[in-house]
């Protein structure tokens, strides 16, 4: 009776084909859990964000005080805000691992799935930036001023764009209200893109660590892989609650505990840690327009992955040179993030420029050359062995 019910009702049939009877490769590892963990983080962010919005006042005179009110006076408000702060860091941690797994195991060859995922990543970055401005602390205000002012580098219409975003001649009350509206609405657009991402994924099927055709050996998603996801959920929730209770402000900037003051510039303006790699690339180039182009390319380079890596093999599992290049890219990414948190002074300026060059050199030169040459080396070895 249960089997008939979940396959006869149209809604249940859709859920059944996506979560229960979905044919999945039998050898996928826990690295494949980070997609569902990212989805769980998104759900937690939306729920906690809705609760915070009920007590938030989008006014430059009240925003900081309403944030203090949430923490001090609202029942459980401190915990909800801590979950929202820590959840953002955990969300991007899961997303970075998810993207890294996609590069390592060649998931970018599912073009529709990959492109929808990159769009989701860019939307996440924009949403997080908008949310960072809302508490209207000192770092929030100056981050909004610096980042939105980058639009002025757009030829012909830069000044008009900046004033449109600001709602005036400087960052102020209209800016805060616009950012709240966009920060409230964009997560729902992210849900839509996530569903599109899932539809495309289920159309082609998941990849596997071996990089071979998975159709030879598939198992139903439930109960085998669903229990792996549930285990991942339990670990993530445990870590999130522990982090929110013990180290809630580890990733925040101390300057943001002071109200915004347009007359005092912080000695070092920096965004949250998950923006630091792109921020470091932006600062490494003295020219504003060139820096913005490099910033955009640091994210949109993911869209070019299917073109840049043209190997006959899907996964890097059997490509040792590509593995070395991949981990070099990961180390450089971490190094760039560290440099983004440093003051803009020697020797960090030169180090940022070198690390930014390495970042693009890996993607545009090393990945294409090594992927093609490693194929030829393996073919030569197979021919004469």
Curated annotation (Swiss-Prot):
<keyword id="KW-0830">Ubiquinone</keyword>
<keyword id="KW-0813">Transport</keyword>
<feature type="transmembrane region" description="Helical">
    <location>
        <begin position="34"/>
        <end position="54"/>
    </location>
</feature>
<feature type="binding site" description="axial binding residue">
    <location>
        <position position="197"/>
    </location>
    <ligand>
        <name>heme b b566</name>
    </ligand>
</feature>
<keyword id="KW-0999">Mitochondrion inner membrane</keyword>
<feature type="binding site" description="axial binding residue">
    <location>
        <position position="183"/>
    </location>
    <ligand>
        <name>heme b b562</name>
    </ligand>
</feature>
<feature type="transmembrane region" description="Helical">
    <location>
        <begin position="289"/>
        <end position="309"/>
    </location>
</feature>
<dbReference type="InterPro" id="IPR005798">
    <property type="entry name" value="Cyt_b/b6_C"/>
</dbReference>
<keyword id="KW-0479">Metal-binding</keyword>
<feature type="transmembrane region" description="Helical">
    <location>
        <begin position="348"/>
        <end position="368"/>
    </location>
</feature>
<dbReference type="InterPro" id="IPR036150">
    <property type="entry name" value="Cyt_b/b6_C_sf"/>
</dbReference>
<dbReference type="InterPro" id="IPR048260">
    <property type="entry name" value="Cytochrome_b_C_euk/bac"/>
</dbReference>
<feature type="binding site" description="axial binding residue">
    <location>
        <position position="84"/>
    </location>
    <ligand>
        <name>heme b b562</name>
    </ligand>
</feature>
<dbReference type="InterPro" id="IPR005797">
    <property type="entry name" value="Cyt_b/b6_N"/>
</dbReference>
<dbReference type="GO" id="GO:0046872">
    <property type="term" value="F:metal ion binding"/>
</dbReference>
<dbReference type="InterPro" id="IPR027387">
    <property type="entry name" value="Cytb/b6-like_sf"/>
</dbReference>
<dbReference type="InterPro" id="IPR016174">
    <property type="entry name" value="Di-haem_cyt_TM"/>
</dbReference>
<keyword id="KW-0249">Electron transport</keyword>
<comment type="function">
    <text>Component of the ubiquinol-cytochrome c reductase complex (complex III or cytochrome b-c1 complex) that is part of the mitochondrial respiratory chain. The b-c1 complex mediates electron transfer from ubiquinol to cytochrome c. Contributes to the generation of a proton gradient across the mitochondrial membrane that is then used for ATP synthesis.</text>
</comment>
<protein>
    <recommendedName>
        <fullName>Cytochrome b</fullName>
    </recommendedName>
</protein>
<dbReference type="Pfam" id="PF00032">
    <property type="entry name" value="Cytochrom_B_C"/>
</dbReference>
<dbReference type="GO" id="GO:0045275">
    <property type="term" value="C:respiratory chain complex III"/>
</dbReference>
<feature type="transmembrane region" description="Helical">
    <location>
        <begin position="179"/>
        <end position="199"/>
    </location>
</feature>
<dbReference type="Pfam" id="PF00033">
    <property type="entry name" value="Cytochrome_B"/>
</dbReference>
<keyword id="KW-0349">Heme</keyword>
<feature type="binding site">
    <location>
        <position position="202"/>
    </location>
    <ligand>
        <name>a ubiquinone</name>
    </ligand>
</feature>
<feature type="transmembrane region" description="Helical">
    <location>
        <begin position="78"/>
        <end position="99"/>
    </location>
</feature>
<keyword id="KW-0496">Mitochondrion</keyword>
<comment type="subunit">
    <text>The cytochrome bc1 complex contains 3 respiratory subunits (MT-CYB, CYC1 and UQCRFS1), 2 core proteins (UQCRC1 and UQCRC2) and probably 6 low-molecular weight proteins.</text>
</comment>
<feature type="transmembrane region" description="Helical">
    <location>
        <begin position="227"/>
        <end position="247"/>
    </location>
</feature>
<keyword id="KW-0679">Respiratory chain</keyword>
<dbReference type="InterPro" id="IPR030689">
    <property type="entry name" value="Cytochrome_b"/>
</dbReference>
<feature type="binding site" description="axial binding residue">
    <location>
        <position position="98"/>
    </location>
    <ligand>
        <name>heme b b566</name>
    </ligand>
</feature>
<comment type="similarity">
    <text>Belongs to the cytochrome b family.</text>
</comment>
<keyword id="KW-0408">Iron</keyword>
<keyword id="KW-0472">Membrane</keyword>
<dbReference type="GO" id="GO:0008121">
    <property type="term" value="F:ubiquinol-cytochrome-c reductase activity"/>
</dbReference>
<feature type="transmembrane region" description="Helical">
    <location>
        <begin position="321"/>
        <end position="341"/>
    </location>
</feature>
<keyword id="KW-0812">Transmembrane</keyword>
<dbReference type="GO" id="GO:0005743">
    <property type="term" value="C:mitochondrial inner membrane"/>
</dbReference>
<dbReference type="InterPro" id="IPR048259">
    <property type="entry name" value="Cytochrome_b_N_euk/bac"/>
</dbReference>
<dbReference type="GO" id="GO:0006122">
    <property type="term" value="P:mitochondrial electron transport, ubiquinol to cytochrome c"/>
</dbReference>
């Amino acid at each position: 009776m249960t089997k008939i019910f979940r396959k006869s009702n149209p809604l249940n049939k859709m859920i059944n084909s996506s979560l229960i009877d979905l044919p999945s490769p039998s050898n996928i590892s826990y690295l494949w859990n980070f997609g569902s963990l990212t989805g769980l983080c998104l759900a937690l962010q939306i729920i906690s964000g809705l609760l915070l919005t009920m007590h938030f006042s989008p006014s430059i005179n009240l925003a900081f005080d309403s944030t203090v009110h949430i923490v001090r006076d609202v029942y459980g408000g401190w915990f909800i805000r801590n979950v929202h702060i820590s959840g953002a860091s955990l969300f991007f941690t899961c997303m970075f691992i998810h993207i890294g797994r996609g590069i390592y195991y060649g998931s970018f060859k599912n073009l529709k799935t990959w492109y929808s995922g990159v769009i989701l990543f860019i939307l996440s970055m924009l949403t997080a930036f908008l949310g960072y401005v809302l508490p209207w602390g000192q770092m929030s205000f100056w981050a909004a001023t610096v980042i939105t002012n980058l639009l002025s580098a757009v030829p012909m219409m830069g000044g008009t764009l900046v004033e449109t975003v600001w709602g005036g001649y400087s960052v102020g009350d209209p800016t805060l209200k616009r950012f709240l509206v966009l920060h409230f609405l964009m997560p729902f657009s992210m849900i839509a893109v996530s569903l599109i991402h899932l539809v495309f994924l289920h159309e082609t099927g998941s990849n596997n660590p071996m990089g071979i055709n998975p159709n030879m050996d598939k198992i139903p998603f439930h109960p085998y892989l669903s229990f792996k996801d549930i285990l991942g959920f339990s670990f993530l929730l445990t870590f999130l609650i522990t982090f929110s209770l013990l180290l809630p402000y580890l990733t925040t900037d101390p300057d943001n505990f002071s109200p915004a003051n347009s007359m005092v510039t912080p000695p070092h303006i920096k965004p949250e840690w998950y923006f630091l790699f792109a921020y470091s690339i932006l600062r490494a180039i003295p020219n504003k327009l060139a820096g913005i182009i490099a910033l955009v390319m640091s994210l949109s380079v993911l869209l070019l992955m299917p073109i840049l890596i043209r190997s006959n093999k899907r996964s890097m599992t059997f490509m040792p040179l590509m593995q070395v290049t991949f981990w070099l890219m990961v180390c450089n990414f971490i190094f760039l993030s560290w440099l983004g948190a440093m003051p803009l002074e020697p020797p960090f300026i030169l180090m940022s420029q070198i690390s930014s060059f390495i970042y693009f050199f890996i993607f545009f030169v090393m990945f294409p050359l090594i992927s093609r040459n490693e194929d030829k080396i393996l073919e030569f070895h197979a021919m004469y062995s």
